[in-house]
């Protein structure tokens, strides 16, 4: 990997984090997971008549082939979240490497702050599908704090990396009283001026425009302190989604191999002390 302005102290973690994202990207580009992008089904003459009647493949599936409807819906949602995550994170990390930290933090907003809530709903919220399908004004990324904390805590039951708790992820991403949380720093990156009491820009200032070398060092520090835990957390949730929702199509023997690979990647960034 070629480094530009990234300080030496962050390079091992940067490299490991980039590898975690590449491992997640295997769900998009790997031949073992092609089923996420290709679904085939034979249609009888009766099915074709029903499809003509409905005029839309989604309406047809929902009315006449409900099981296939939910399978295809899950594939579209998970694949979309995977692409968002990988594409935004790769660009964010590349911008960090080039010291374009305002762009780097702005790019964290959609995949980490917003899309995580949708992934949590898919995995944990029993009412998600009814709301998503039936309500025109439903926003799955809107979530009150109590519900968000509850769903994050529920992930502790399905993940293997127990030290990275749901409550810790909340502190890293969503805690408004934490100046270094992703939501606070991404807000500052997106908006020239922020006015909330916990994230106020202040007089004679614009967010990220008067950044000193000391400020830049602190921004890098926050970025690489939280990023490994967030990526491991996300990697495990994507594993739960793919290997939980598509058991009939995925090779389940790949699951432990992915966990082993994840552990090896992180060991390169945090080697055990002898």
What are these regions (language model features)?
Residues 67-78, 90-177:
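Short non-catalytic regulatory patches outside canonical folded cores
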Residues 1-77, 95, 131-147, 181-274:
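A cross-kingdom marker of C-terminal helix-rich interaction/assembly modules
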Residues 37-50, 81-86, 113, 159-163:
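Short, charge-rich amphipathic segments
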Residues 81-85, 176-184:
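Short, well-ordered alpha-helical segments
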Residues 61-66, 83-90:
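A short glycine/small-residue-enriched secondary-structure motif
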């Amino acid at each position: 990997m070629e480094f530009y302005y990234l300080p030496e102290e962050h390079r091992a973690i940067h490299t490991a984090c980039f590898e975690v994202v590449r491992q997640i990207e295997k769900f998009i580009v790997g031949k073992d997971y092609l089923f996420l992008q290709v679904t085939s089904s034979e249609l009888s003459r009766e099915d074709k008549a029903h499809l003509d009647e409905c005029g839309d493949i989604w309406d047809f599936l929902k009315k006449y082939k409900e099981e296939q409807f939910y399978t295809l819906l899950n594939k579209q949602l998970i694949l979309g979240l995977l692409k968002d995550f990988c594409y935004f994170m790769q660009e964010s990390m590349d911008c960090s490497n080039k010291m374009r930290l305002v762009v780097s933090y702005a790019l964290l907003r959609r995949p980490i702050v917003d899309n995580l809530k949708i992934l949590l709903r898919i995995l944990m919220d029993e009412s998600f599908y009814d709301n998503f399908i039936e309500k025109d004004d439903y926003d799955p990324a809107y979530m009150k704090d109590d519900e968000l904390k509850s769903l994050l805590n529920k992930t502790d039951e399905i993940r293997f990396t127990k030290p990275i708790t749901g409550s810790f992820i909340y502190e890293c991403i969503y805690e408004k009283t934490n100046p270094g949380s992703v939501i606070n720093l991404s807000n500052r990156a997106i908006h020239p001026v922020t006015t909330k009491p916990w994230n106020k820009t202040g007089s004679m200032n614009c967010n990220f425009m008067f950044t000193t070398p000391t400020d830049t060092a602190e921004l890098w520090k926050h970025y690489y302190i939280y990023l490994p835990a967030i990526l491991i957390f996300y990697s495990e949730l994507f594993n739960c989604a793919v290997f939980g929702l598509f058991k009939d199509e995925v090779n389940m023997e790949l699951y432990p191999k992915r966990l082993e690979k994840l552990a090896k990647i992180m060991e390169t960034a945090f080697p055990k002390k002898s």
